Design a protein with these regions (language model features):
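N-terminal Sec-pathway targeting helices
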Residues: 2-17
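Hydrophobic core
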Residues: 18-22
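Hydrophobic single-pass membrane-insertion segments
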Residues: 24-34
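A domain-level signal for caspase-like cysteine endopeptidase catalytic cores
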Residues: 32-155, 162
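Extracytoplasmic/periplasmic, Sec-exported soluble proteins
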Residues: 52-60, 91, 179-184, 193, ...
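Short amphipathic alpha-helical segments and helix-helix/interface helices
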Residues: 65, 88-89, 188-193, 215-216, ...
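Cysteine protease catalytic core and zymogen-processing segment of caspase-like enzymes
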Residues: 108-226
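Active-site-proximal C-terminal subdomain of hydrolase catalytic domains
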Residues: 199-284
Length: 284
């Protein structure tokens, strides 16, 4: 009897949540269309590092910040604990012109959507309305594989001044990961508050441009350009490609085609443990 009462209460709770969610959807959708371009003439950029807790890379922060500051941006850095669902909802209001995201990403085969991970561990009791509407999803990152020499000597093949790979056999170690909340294109469309002001997005994570769903949602929200990966990518290649993109795009001021060509030359899929291409999606 107790279980039946509890079940009825839970069903009632979910029904009420759906009604509240519907009202919230309408309110947020209307509010989300408000523009937010009050930047006082200051160029602002941000590095959003969802990976930092599990895969820290302070030298990446330092170098990326240096490139952005040299290009005239004031730079903020947010790490795993800051990267929440609510953080992403408010992102357009923060008035960033250049947004670099270091993150786990994946594509949801069921909905044909790309999703970006937050730093929030998944719980079915949180973000109930967002889960019901498919604006956030449960996602598990690809297991990290740590490579180590299987023999006493390493056999490295030098490709160029900045890239080399190991030819001999390696031993692998798998590292378990948690489930996280991930944001979908529907969250960008429905729940982000404000508009981006011709913002450039660098989406550094697996499959962030495996299909254009997430990039298109950012473009519709006011972004001008989105770059990312068309497939799974190793962390070391991800970090190198992002830094090369910032160098060639901001410092050398190459156009997009030449910038991506330079990245392809230096981070060539032929030599990557997970072959992937750094590509872009622009406003038409």
């Amino acid at each position: 009897m107790k279980n039946k009462i509890y079940s009825n209460i839970k069903i009632l709770f979910v029904a009420v949540a759906v009604i509240i969610a519907s009202i919230t959807y309408i309110i947020f959708f209307q509010v989300g269309e408000a523009e937010s371009f009050d930047n006082d003439g200051i160029l602002r950029a941000v590095i959003i590092d969802q990976l930092y807790e599990d895969i820290p890379n302070d030298s990446f922060h330092d170098e990326a910040k240096k490139y952005l500051e040299t290009a005239g941006y004031e730079v903020d850095i947010f790490t795993t604990k800051d990267v929440t669902v609510d953080f992403y909802k408010k992102l357009p209001q923060m008035n960033y012109k250049y947004i670099v995201i270091r993150t786990h990403g994946t594509d949801d085969k069921a909905d044909n959507d790309v999703v970006l991970f937050t730093g929030e561990k998944y719980s079915e009791d949180n973000y109930i309305s967002e889960q019901l509407f498919g604006q956030v999803k449960k996602a598990t990152p690809l297991l990290e594989i740590a490579y180590s020499p299987s023999g006493s000597l390493s056999d490295w093949v030098i490709v160029n001044d900045t890239y080399r790979y190991q030819k001999n056999s390696v031993a692998t170690q798998e590292t378990a990961e948690h489930e996280y909340f991930a944001i979908s294109p529907k969250l960008v469309k429905d729940l982000m508050n404000g508009k981006f002001d011709d913002t450039t997005f660098v989406l550094g994570g697996c499959k962030t441009l495996a299909n254009p769903s997430f990039a298109a949602s950012l473009i519709n929200r006011g972004a001008s350009t989105v770059v990312g990966w068309d497939n799974t990518v190793a962390n070391i290649d991800n970090d190198r490609a992002i830094l090369l993109f910032l160098k060639y795009n901001l410092i050398e001021q190459y156009d997009m085609v030449k910038t991506l060509d330079m990245i392809h030359t230096n981070v060539n899929p032929i030599y990557m443990p997970y072959p992937a291409n750094f590509i872009h999606y622009d406003r038409i």
